Amino acid sequence: MSSQAIYRIYGLRVRSDLPLPVASISDDGEVDLIVRRGGAVPRPVAPQPPGMALDWQEVDQGWLLRYHTRTDEVLEFAYNRDASQLEIRSTTPEMTDDITALLVGAGLATALHLRGVPVLHASAIVVDGEAILVAGAAGAGKSTLTAALVAKGAPLLAEDLAVLTFGENGITVQAGYPRLRLCPDATLIAGRAAPDLPRVFSGFVPDDKRWVEATTLPGGFRTTPAPLGGIYLLAPRRPERETPAIEPLPPHRAGLALLDHLYGTRWLRIPKVKALEWCARIAGRTPVRVVHAPPGLERVKETAEAIVADVRSFSQEVTEGTES
């Protein structure tokens, strides 16, 4: 039997026989989720998909999240009804690095969804003790900008999933894992050369991204939750943009904009009423901004500086308003 360890990630205490990219913690007997590696599954006889296919369905024992690649590899995350147990099955069980990369993303996000926890597809860094989220459409530069912020000295809190907890005194963002996944050219933002860095995926996913350890960067990694202080949504880049610009959104527009950044809204089939409720609560208690960034990798640090300055400007306004 494989050895198991206990980890705290996204606010969950996870017992897993698959090593997770966070430090293990002491076992006091309390566990929210048990992760086990199951047996190998046969390759499907169905036609190969043109790319990575994702299937989410209810099954007799609970729920099944299934990946099917164009090379006919399969990865399954099987959840019981209350998402307290997760079994992982694959045609390539030896690809533990690939499986782990998907587990700490979609695998755990799905478990949180089944538990009714809101998750934004966003990174989180910490500025002056508050969690600042960065979200954007695919290719908008979210991870690259996050790397620039951590390289500038802001601790990383979560790389791709902003797991939220609603409380009486505000919203809290849970800590994820201390890694960034970056495209090869973007690793230079973190002062690293791509050939020297491990690949996120070794073959299961056709992806050339690399892991960068946040603990090797000036900002490092924050292991504890932080109160949500602001959300920055990246607008599509325009070639004519010369300097960063940051636009505040009123709560009603912010709530609608956040709908596009709830994790797995479409394939997890989150009820629209629930999605609207979550986004309205977030927007009603949190400043939401749109970031118009100039194009070019060489301008990313400039955008990072503009965001930090905006966060501190807003925090100062709140402090002055409270004192008056």
Task: Give the positions of each predicted feature.
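Glycine-rich, often acidic-flanked micro-motifs
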Residues: S2-P19, A23-S24, V127-A137, A151-F314
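Post-Walker A alpha-helix
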Residues: L145-T146
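Short glycine-rich, low-complexity/disordered patches
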Residues: G116-H121, V290-A293, S324
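Short, low-complexity, charge-dense intrinsically disordered segments
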Residues: Q316-S324
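Long, basic/Gly/Ser/Thr-rich N-terminal segments
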Residues: M1-M95, I307-R312
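Extreme N-terminal, non-catalytic leader segments
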Residues: Y67-A131
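Conserved lysine of the Walker
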Residues: K142
